[in-house]
Amino acid sequence: MIGVGSAIRYAISKIKKDADADDYFWNALIWCILSSMLFVFAGIFFSADIMRVLGADEHIVAVGNNYTKIFMCFAPMFMCNYVTNAFVRNDGAPGIAMSATLFSSLFNIVFDYILMFPMNLGMEGAALATALSPIIGMGICSIHFFSKKSSVRLVVCKPSVRKLVAGSQLGVSAFVGEMSSAVITLAFNFVILKLAGNVGVAAYGVV
């Protein structure tokens, strides 16, 4: 919501030639980092409880607790990746944004295997592969930021609640779409968990 909305607000402000248009990029990054601290805190102290609320039994909690903890501790990377991707896409470089998404996903798939099996890191390795993938995405997006074609400038400024609200208003539709997908997936998981247990949920996740 913050990333997509701020990127749209930035594009509108740039067209209007507003002097503070570039502030939206830094502002979005700062607010994403600040809000992601809630996920980091929850991941460190309440990862097992979160898994239980989402329907995991004690066996799954024992196996996946470290995965959840590592994954949530990297929340700042995931949220900042959404911001950089949205700004690159709105700055006339959708190809780079798509490449960032594609290669970060490929990195995740390949390093899931490498870290889990050859390096024998198990679920922690899978979590690290997933957690590091947004860094790859941001690295690819930075190619655009450092190019001459980029109009996005990283202007350090104080976090602005007004700009946060202005950006978030335009990102509500994206937020609703993401939340709808999450709720549907969660509902399916609960139903399948009752019908087929953990194996059924795993099979549904693969499909």
Give short role names for the model-derived ranges.
Residues 1-37, 41, 78-97, 203-207:
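Small-residue-rich hydrophobic transmembrane alpha-helices
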Residues 32, 71, 97, 101, ...:
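Residue-level signature of transmembrane alpha-helical cores of multipass secondary-active transporters
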Residues 38-69:
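Short membrane-interface helical motifs at transmembrane helix boundaries
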Residues 51-58, 114-121, 175, 182-207:
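Helix-terminus/linker motif at the lipid-water interface of multi-pass membrane proteins
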Residues 56-64, 68, 75-102:
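Cytoplasmic helix-loop-helix junction between adjacent transmembrane helices
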Residues 62, 130, 141-181:
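Interhelical loop/hinge segments that connect adjacent transmembrane helices in multipass membrane
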Residues 64-68, 127, 198-206:
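Small-residue hotspots at the loop-to-helix junctions and early N-terminal turns
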Residues 95, 105-139:
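Membrane-interface helix-loop junctions in multi-pass transport and translocation proteins
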